[in-house]
């Protein structure tokens, strides 16, 4: 920074101790005591981990709900011509594919 007047900053008249003296601290004060509070970085990391876990659980729930709704609507919208395609989407989640007897066609599967 050119043009800045630094006179009066940091001269020895600001400090009451003699010139050349040093302040020393005992070694135990330089370390964190065992009862010290966790640092802010530790708390932020745990908070982010908790938020990520909640987002994961909610997204898995939404995914499961989407699969169940898709199965529900696919089950209703598929044509009754093909028996195997009618029951394949809902067989995994629903136990609604049950046999019924017909005099003309014999035993078939029906998704109700």
UniProtKB/Swiss-Prot annotation:
Gene Ontology cellular component? host cell membrane; membrane
Please state the protein's primary subcellular location.
host cell
Q: Which domain of life is it from?
A: Viruses
Keyword Transmembrane on entry: yes
The subcellular location is: Host membrane
Q: Where is the composition biased (Low complexity)?
A: 1-10
Name of protein = Protein ORF1
Which stretches are transmembrane?
A: 51-71
Keyword Transmembrane helix on this protein?
A: yes
Query: What membrane topology term does the record carry?
Result: Single-pass membrane protein
Residue span of region Disordered? 1-20
Which keywords, in A-to-Z order, does the entry hold? Host membrane, Membrane, Transmembrane, Transmembrane helix
């Amino acid at each position: 920074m050119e043009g800045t007047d630094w006179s009066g900053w940091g001269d020895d008249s600001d400090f009451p101790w003699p010139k050349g003296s040093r302040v020393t601290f005992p070694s135990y004060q330089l370390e964190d005591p065992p009862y010290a509070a966790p640092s802010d970085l530790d708390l932020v990391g745990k908070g982010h981990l908790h938020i990520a876990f909640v987002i994961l659980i909610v997204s898995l729930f939404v995914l499961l709900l989407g699969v169940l709704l898709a199965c529900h609507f696919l089950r209703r919208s598929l044509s009754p011509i093909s028996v195997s395609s009618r029951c394949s989407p809902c067989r995994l989640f629903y136990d609604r594919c049950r046999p019924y007897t017909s005099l003309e066609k014999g035993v078939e599967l029906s998704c109700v």
